[in-house]
Amino acid sequence: MIKKIIFYPPILASIAAAGCISLLALMSDATSTFILWMIPTFGASVVLITALPNSPLARPKNIIFGHLISAASGVLLATIVIPSFYSLGIAVGLAIFFMMITDCLHPPAGGNPILVILSGSILEFNLLPLAVGVLFISIYAVILNKIILKRDYPWF
């Protein structure tokens, strides 16, 4: 009976998501850069890896490259135009375009160009925490889904 309750999908997804975000927060706290490492789009990525692990949008490849491609589109637009209503839209549109043509669509990453542009300066939006965070989330997803839960989950 207890095993059935623990492995009830909403409970399992909630516990797994809480664990992933808590570990990211612990890593952030340990490096004394709490805010830098806690990127809001990570929350939505964790929803996909824990609640919808069979979705193609939750593949490690999509998580990693989707976030990096989207952030890069934000950096590109922040570099060549003054932040405005249209630069936000164009950056998100570019992110979607490049994620789709590379088969790396990851909807949570669509928020990254907005974060980059609204940060006020591309220097203020550090790509390192994003890269480390998405690698951590992807490794967590593989360990959770493929190794612990024995799901048919891609390595990459």
Model-predicted segments: where are they?
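Hydrophobic alpha-helical segments of small multi-pass membrane proteins
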Residues: A91-F97, P113-G120, A131-L135
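Alpha-helical transmembrane segments and their membrane-interface boundaries
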Residues: M1-L68, A72, L76, I80-G89, ...
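Mid-sequence acidic-hydrophobic segments that form the walls
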Residues: I96-I101, I117, V142, K146
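Internal alpha-helical transmembrane segments of multi-pass membrane proteins
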Residues: I82-H106
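Membrane-helix interface "capping/anchor" motifs
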Residues: P53-N62, M100-G110
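Generic transmembrane alpha-helix signature in multi-pass membrane proteins
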Residues: G74-A78, G111-L118
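Non-transmembrane, interaction-prone segments in cytosolic or luminal domains
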Residues: V46, A109-N112
